[in-house]
Curated annotation (Swiss-Prot):
Primary gene name: mtnN
Key words of the record: Amino-acid biosynthesis, Hydrolase, Methionine biosynthesis
Subunit structure: Homodimer.
Lineage: superkingdom: Bacteria
Physiological role: Catalyzes the irreversible cleavage of the glycosidic bond in both 5'-methylthioadenosine (MTA) and S-adenosylhomocysteine (SAH/AdoHcy) to adenine and the corresponding thioribose, 5'-methylthioribose and S-ribosylhomocysteine, respectively. Also cleaves 5'-deoxyadenosine, a toxic by-product of radical S-adenosylmethionine (SAM) enzymes, into 5-deoxyribose and adenine. Thus, is required for in vivo function of the radical SAM enzymes biotin synthase and lipoic acid synthase, that are inhibited by 5'-deoxyadenosine accumulation.
Biological processes per GO annotation: L-methionine salvage from methylthioadenosine; L-methionine salvage from S-adenosylmethionine; purine deoxyribonucleoside catabolic process
Name the record gives this protein: 5'-methylthioadenosine/S-adenosylhomocysteine nucleosidase
Organism: Buchnera aphidicola subsp. Acyrthosiphon pisum (strain Tuc7)
Catalytic residues in the record: 12, 197
The family this protein is said to belong to: Belongs to the PNP/UDP phosphorylase family. MtnN subfamily.
Catalytic class of the enzyme: hydrolase
Length: 232
């Protein structure tokens, strides 16, 4: 299989590079791509940069140049629920934008015209991890993840998001944009996130302190996915 992997920042991609064999580095404009192998898979790891547009461009680069069979987005997220702890893994069932509002035209908050109100992801890997939970002994939480072009870092912002999206459990800045592109081109998408902060007034400091822990947790899950992707 040909597998594209997207991480937003250095800490996320550096960990992932260590599980790719014999990679070479290529640069497309400002985007770094690491091309290598994982067992029989051809792997294309790209550092997208932060935010929705950067993530969309990175996704299109992978699709245009390498025609991946599956894309994996791995990265950090801020918690919207008190039961989530630093380093917890989120495998979302759905993702949507929190900063899109066309409700005056009859659309659901977060919905782009011509697209579903939420993007469904991870159906196969949710079933896989459910069946193999004892084998791998890795805990994860399922739920809705929100995306937008703001690093959420205020208690008041959390209240607003929870009111607008009661079922959301975490928030970040790339996954819905990647999901929109994959939806358009009918490419299966796997999203794995790990909690770096509580999206509160201490979020900036906590993110910096915890990003290495988060990246380590993510790399473990991504490796398991790569090892078992054909069987999912």
């Amino acid at each position: 299989m040909k597998i594209g992997i997207i991480g937003a920042i250095n800490q996320e991609t550096e960990r992932l590079k260590k599980i790719i064999h014999f990679y070479i580095e290529k640069k497309i404009n400002t985007y770094k791509i690491y091309i290598g192998k994982f067992k029989s898979h051809d792997v294309f790891l790209i550092k997208s940069g932060i935010g929705k547009v950067s993530a969309s461009i990175a996704t299109m680069i992978l699709i245009d140049l390498y025609k991946p069979d599956t894309i994996i987005n791995s990265g950090s997220a801020g918690s919207l629920q008190s039961f989530l702890k630093i380093g917890d893994i989120i495998i979302p069932k759905k993702t949507c934008y929190y900063d899109v509002d066309l409700t005056n035209f009859g659309y659901t908050r977060g919905q782009i015209p011509g697209y579903p109100k939420e993007f469904t992801v991870n159906e196969k890997i949710c079933n896989f991890f459910k069946k193999n939970a004892d084998k791998y002994q890795l805990k994860y939480i399922k739920g809705l993840i929100l995306s937008g072009d703001t690093f959420v870092r205020e208690n008041e912002s959390i209240k607003i998001l929870k009111k607008q999206f009661p079922s959301a459990i975490a928030v970040e800045m790339e996954s819905s944009a990647i999901a929109q592109v994959c939806y358009k081109f009918n490419i299966p998408l796997i999203i794995i996130k790990s909690i770096s902060d509580a999206s509160d007034n201490n979020a900036t400091v906590n993110f910096k302190e915890n990003i290495d822990i988060v990246s380590y947790q993510l790399s473990k899950f991504v490796k398991i996915i790569l090892e078992n992707l054909i069987d999912m």
